[in-house]
């Protein structure tokens, strides 16, 4: 089951699973926490969407997300601290990025969006090619996405357009 903000179910699947459309919006953090605490729910992971780097999407999540897709680390490590990222294999290959590189994200999914220059990301790892959507993603913590937008970690973004 995929849970997200009100809107088109197709758009929710395209944005939340395949990362091919704009997100439908945010749900309240309290609602997400309640769902995760439900004993009938086996697995949840958050997705904080809305930014990119050179057309590759940045996804704020937790370490359960890459485990769900059974992707392995080829070089370096998973992100551990705010503003650290682990790159999908195609992202690293196409952009020529490696562990230790830094980059500035753009707001939105097209090049030229407003940049988050005050919060550069640091590459800490690169996933091995997996044949999954993770190959095309830049993964980081949800807290990193909040920081990039100048929002205090834990703030409810349900009414925000990020």
What are these regions (language model features)?
Residues 1-57, 67, 81:
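Hydrophobic, regular-secondary-structure patches
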Residues 52-62, 71-162:
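Hydrophobic secondary-structure segments that place a key small or acidic residue at a functional site
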